Amino acid sequence: MTEKSWFETIFCCCCHRTPIIRREIKLGCFGIGSAGKTTFLKVLKGEDPRDLLRTNGFSTVKMEYDETFHLTIYDVGGDKGIRGIWSNYYAEVHGIIYVIDYSTDETFTESIEALHSLTSNPHVQKKPIFLLLNNQNNREFDDVEISNETKIQAGQHKIVLFSHFNKYNGYLDNIKSATLTVMARAKKDRNEYQEQFVRFIDSISEHYVELSEGVKTAELALRIRQEEAKEQRRLMQMKVEHDALKADVAGLELRNQPPVQPPIPPDPPSDPKSASVHIEESPPMSLASSTIPSDIIQSTPETGTPRDPVNFCRISQTSTKPVSPESNSVKEEPTIILKDNYFLPPKAPGRQYSRIQRIQNVLNNRVVPK
């Protein structure tokens, strides 16, 4: 068996070394407005916390804890109008950091009320909680009294750790320790809140698998809700575009449609007295009769001869005979057969009268009403 050279021994060990996979721990940092959440996270990371802006909404802070874990902390605003979004983060984190503002009695009471609302949420139960009392004015306090005010029951959470954080004294102004991990900085500075925070992370690492299952389930549900909301917005946009296109098509069809004609009124009802009157179709008018007046008609002859075509021409009106006394009671309607208003030529062969004579005979035989 050949021995390995020193070169192969060194480089083979480096190549076959198992890479360290850092697991992620997600935390949520909550508290009322101006409670000192961002200040605490800056100091925990080893950065200067001065000249900070007020957090509106939320911000994400990332830091390395040790060689095994790295931290992602959601710094959520604490104004009354923003506290409604706190519940959106409870299920998606492994643990809770809650900062209590102990500057005045009013801020302390408000912080305790917000804490009660937070711990009553079912997604917060069975998760580790780190309570940090931010004593900016260095007031005296009793740990037992404050713990009783929180009213957090034993066994309701995995573990509840309590610590306090006094006003920043500027010890990080000239120290560049931001490159250190949280664990290394805690061993170096040995502050009480850092030691309690390390215990808080250790409790999460002990139950990491169980807590991660809940976080993954919440993240999956969040992605499903986001996809559903995205699909709903897409469908709404498609509906708006479809309605707009439909309105454009309707406008074009209305523009190309011919104008609507007004309805034609129906004919008035006919007179029942004239129901017995029969209008016959007139034959084509001849040139010989084109000059006959239009009010002259030809009646059916009763006593005249067929050779006399002008003997029975009458005006189109009712009879002019005097009414007898016997006819006052019963009035008969004469039946008149109307024909076209022109003169027909004689039926006998040959013309016995000229055109002018026929017209003259018609005019002489007209009955003028008295």
Swiss-Prot record:
PANTHER family registered for this protein in UniProt: ADP-RIBOSYLATION FACTOR-LIKE PROTEIN 13B
Sequence segments annotated as region (RVVP region): 366-369
Lineage of producing organism: Eukaryota, Metazoa, Ecdysozoa, Nematoda, Chromadorea
Domain remarks: The RVVP region and palmitoylation sites are required for compartmentalization inside cilium to prevent distal cilium and nuclear targeting.
BP GO terms, sorted: cilium assembly; intraciliary transport; non-motile cilium assembly; receptor localization to non-motile cilium; sensory perception of chemical stimulus
Subcellular location: Cell projection, Cilium membrane
Effect of K230R: Does not affect sumoylation
GO CC terms, sorted: ciliary inversin compartment; ciliary membrane; cilium; leading edge of dendritic growth cone; microvillus membrane; non-motile cilium
Tissue: Specifically expressed in ciliated sensory neurons throughout development in both hermaphrodites.
Effect of K239R: Decreased sumoylation. Abolishes sumoylation
Compositionally biased intervals (Pro residues): 259-271
Source species: Caenorhabditis elegans
Family under the similarity heading: Belongs to the small GTPase superfamily. Arf family.
Protein name stated in the entry: ADP-ribosylation factor-like protein 13B
Keyword terms: Cell membrane, Cell projection, Cilium, GTP-binding, Isopeptide bond, Lipoprotein, Membrane, Nucleotide-binding, Palmitate, Ubl conjugation
Covalent link (Glycyl lysine isopeptide (Lys-Gly) (interchain with G-Cter in SUMO)) residue numbers: K239, K331
Biased composition (Polar residues): 287-303, 314-328
Function recorded in the entry: Cilium-specific protein required to control the microtubule-based, ciliary axoneme structure. Required for normal sensory cilium function. May act by maintaining the association between IFT subcomplexes A and B.
SUPFAM superfamilies, alphabetized: P-loop containing nucleoside triphosphate hydrolases (SSF52540)
Name of encoding gene: arl-13
Gene knockout outcome: Shortened cilia with various ultrastructural deformities and a disrupted association between IFT subcomplexes A and B.
A molecular-function term among this protein's GO annotations: GTP binding
